[in-house]
Amino acid sequence: MKFIIVLLLFFFFKVIDRVICVTPQKLICLKEDVYLGDFFFFLKRKKYIMYDVNIGEGFNLQKEIFYRLSLVIYNLNKKDKINIYYLVLPPWCYVTHWNIRKGNNLRWEFFFNTDIMKKVIPIIEYEEYEKLYGNYSDIMINSKYILDNYKEKSFLILPFEECNINVNRFKQFCKKCEHKYNVLYSGYCTTINTKQSECYSYNMISNYFITSILENLFLYNITSVLIKQSTNILVPFVNELYQSNLEDILLFNNKLLSYGNNYISNILKTNHYISSHLRYTDFKYISRYNVPPIHIALLKLLYIMFINNCRIIFIASDEKVEIQKVINKDFHQYKKHFYFYNNQNNLHEGEFSIIEQWICTRSYIFIGNIFSRFTMNINWERHLINKGQINQNIDLCSYHINDDNDQDIKNSYKKIVHIFNHKALQKIKNIYDNYSDRDKKYINTICYNFLSHFPNNRSIYRKEYITNT
């Protein structure tokens, strides 16, 4: 009898707690999670889904893959009443744009506010998983697309070797051992040993397909599954993430946001500035998008700045040294308008990049590169802080945007307009008049992005960081 009374009291206080949490002062509790809201979640059997991406993928792509897997985890927990599924966060090791190639093994909390993630889905850092189970998983899976017979409705289960063997660095290393197979994990962080391996071939590798595969696998007595090459999973629609409360759970940690906000407050001293991501090193070789010469890009940024009555241009770039040389040589009289973030605190290059992203995120207008994931992540964040209007997020435009035979790139934009602002042109006249007619037309061409690719709601998690924006 006492046990029943205690149980009833437990439920009573749980209900009271959830009612209190819907007050406006605690908006964060309005997130209707699918595991903390279950009173018996602590009694469920713990299952783990590990994943990684192609070796050497960039930071922003790896960040994006998290959304794909988080939706899988969300749906698994929503359906299952017996098990609770944890997403194992792979450590950050080898990342393409980092100078330090190996030996990082950084936790996600080094960059992100993981407490926010935990409010919606169960997560665990790989370091914690390894303490529990070592570098072992029960089964690893991969996927490949059926390209020759798209109408095929069923999927195929193939030997693991028939998936991308070069990406997986897979080998069978001990036929008589319980964990027979071995594969590289999360760049060059470590290797994972597994008992079984399978390759699934299908014409639509969506998060629903992967969820279904995992549901079937966990019917057996297993604890963990490793998903290799999870970049194969299709990008979810924005509304799928929104309906699952997942679209805004990847927020940078307080330390990095503070660095960015302090720079805006103490150095820029205004929120009315424009920002731009100028990417050059590897984008010089993208035939579909011709990046403009640095001096052309800088004059276009000045033009946009004067049109919008701003006085500051913040630039994030992989060619910062070269850009500053051009400014000193050709734009000396406009030098006071250009700002760059300097790594005075000797931060990790991943941290430095995040701070640049946040400064760009909070700007009045952002000018990016439509093919860059760095740009895409800034635009995503901007839409979450009510800076998603079409005139606030502009693309620099391909240098050949005005060529008649470049219709393909034109179709990548929501709209393209030619703006001739006499007042703004007068302020750059001494340089503008020396450019060719082709370059003048490019400077006057403004490209606008599609808004449907991004969320359209204001994030409650970001509210405290943008009070003055």
Curated annotation (Swiss-Prot):
One of its GO terms (cellular component) is endoplasmic reticulum. Disruption phenotype: In S.stephensi mosquito vector, development into ookinete is normal; however, the number of oocysts developing at the basal lamina of the mosquito midgut is reduced resulting in 45-55% fewer sporozoites in the mosquito salivary glands. In sporozoites, cell traversal activity, invasion of host hepatocytes and gliding motility are severely reduced. Also, TRAP, but not CSP, protein levels are reduced and TRAP localization to the cell membrane is impaired. Development in host erythrocytes and gametogenesis are normal. InterPro entries: GDP-Fuc_O-FucTrfase (IPR019378), OFUT2-like (IPR045130). Its EC number is 2.4.1.221. The active site is at residue 57. One of its GO terms (molecular function) is peptide-O-fucosyltransferase activity. Residues 1-18 form the signal peptide. It comes from the Eukaryota. Keywords: Carbohydrate metabolism, Endoplasmic reticulum, Fucose metabolism, Signal, Transferase. GO terms for biological process: fucose metabolic process. The record marks 381 as: Essential for catalytic activity. Pathway: Protein modification; protein glycosylation. It catalyses: L-seryl-[protein] + GDP-beta-L-fucose = 3-O-(alpha-L-fucosyl)-L-seryl-[protein] + GDP + H(+); L-threonyl-[protein] + GDP-beta-L-fucose = 3-O-(alpha-L-fucosyl)-L-threonyl-[protein] + GDP + H(+). GDP-beta-L-fucose binds at residues 56-60, 277-279, 373-374. It is found in: Endoplasmic reticulum. It is an enzyme of class 2 (transferase). Gene3D superfamilies: 3.40.50.11340, 3.40.50.11350. PANTHER family: GDP-FUCOSE PROTEIN O-FUCOSYLTRANSFERASE 2. Belongs to the glycosyltransferase 68 family. Catalyzes the reaction that attaches fucose through an O-glycosidic linkage to a conserved serine or threonine residue in the consensus sequence C1-X-X-S/T-C2 of thrombospondin type I repeats (TSRs) where C1 and C2 are the first and second cysteines of the repeat, respectively. O-fucosylates sporozoite proteins CSP and TRAP. O-fucosylation regulates stability and intracellular trafficking of TRAP but not of CSP. This is GDP-fucose protein O-fucosyltransferase 2.
